């Protein structure tokens, strides 16, 4: 009983247009740009093969297992409108190919090898459908949106944050001072920048201590619960957990992690620690644009966002739609819903390729951050709704009178927008008017309005359908 050695087309084994997808399959939508002369079926089948059981030639050991049970299958290919050389290849992966509770393993399988494949000019993972059978093997966010609101006792409005700038170079004492001023002025949170870890000018332990002091002082004076995202990201998992432990000992409510540079294994480790110890977890997406910005190669951010919800985080940066960083409105709202909601219908107009049912996995608060200021407040309130965190770094610290008045201006603008919305006014149409009215009785807001009245970041978004 020999076996038929040699090389055969992938599509003979891995292109199965008659396949009915199972409820337990992980489904992927790839944007495939094959090399000239490679038919789309072969390219799609090659992706399915190389990201599951296949290799470039038939091997004797194939006979020792059931390929039909374990192989990925390219089950549908559709052309991309307006792109002659591209196709969307849909691939179904049997659940048994993946280790339970490991985003790391999921990505190693699905995107680990196949992106360097010679038969393809480019490849982009546009979306993943995670079946409940797989998502139930993950803890997910340490707490989720409702528990966070209960812990912070803040309801019926977006939360306000501010990244402390200059991001590098402040001493711990001065850093803590800036934190105190912002929280005292009316913000809910302040934030370590993503690259503030533990550098010579400010070691992590000193920063944690001075920030904790600032939090307690601001809480005592305002009667509100305050937080500062203490960045626990470090060079090793052990060091990261050590920092999280210290944050817990200080009694602060929230820590932070850079999940892409830190890696999914570290992130899931930290998320488990945070749930076990009552810490909220803020996630920064530093490095995401390296992966998601090219239209025809890499991975769309909605995939990274889904992966984060599985790995665990209570907040994640998700673009602004209006500020200085990337984000097209409908597409952004698509993955914002994927982060917050339990059940999201397939909607290609928003870039959502599959219906996603998260069952009981807690939701994540999207964070809008980057180049936003008081004039954006009505748009942000309208676009993101209550379940979001609006972060004004320069838009707080750049206030001509200083940090605390900058915080006051943002809080007044937010409360004015929320009140106007609750009274039934149209934020999209009357936004500027609402801000102007509020600035009449808030000199801090009036000063902020004056400084930023002309600022715009008008560039075409790259992230289009």
From Swiss-Prot:
The modification N6,N6,N6-trimethyllysine is found at residue 4. One of its GO terms (molecular function) is ribulose-bisphosphate carboxylase activity. Its cofactor is Mg(2+). Substrate binds at residues 113, 163, 167, 285, 317, 369. The modification N6-carboxylysine is found at residue 191. It comes from the Eukaryota. The disulfide bond which can form in the large chain dimeric partners within the hexadecamer appears to be associated with oxidative stress and protein turnover. Its EC number is 4.1.1.39. SUPFAM superfamilies: RuBisCo, C-terminal domain (SSF51649), RuBisCO, large subunit, small (N-terminal) domain (SSF54966). The keyword Oxidoreductase applies. The active site is at residues 165, 284. Signal peptide: none annotated. Keywords: Calvin cycle, Carbon dioxide fixation, Chloroplast, Disulfide bond, Lyase, Magnesium, Metal-binding, Methylation, Monooxygenase, Oxidoreductase, Photorespiration, Photosynthesis, Plastid. It catalyses: 2 (2R)-3-phosphoglycerate + 2 H(+) = D-ribulose 1,5-bisphosphate + CO2 + H2O; D-ribulose 1,5-bisphosphate + O2 = 2-phosphoglycolate + (2R)-3-phosphoglycerate + 2 H(+). One of its GO terms (biological process) is reductive pentose-phosphate cycle. It holds the Pfam family RuBisCO_large_N. Its main location: plastid. The basic functional RuBisCO is composed of a large chain homodimer in a 'head-to-tail' conformation. In form I RuBisCO this homodimer is arranged in a barrel-like tetramer with the small subunits forming a tetrameric 'cap' on each end of the 'barrel'. Belongs to the RuBisCO large chain family. Type I subfamily. Heterohexadecamer of 8 large chains and 8 small chains; disulfide-linked. The disulfide link is formed within the large subunit homodimers. This is Ribulose bisphosphate carboxylase large chain. It comes from Hamamelis mollis (Chinese witch hazel).
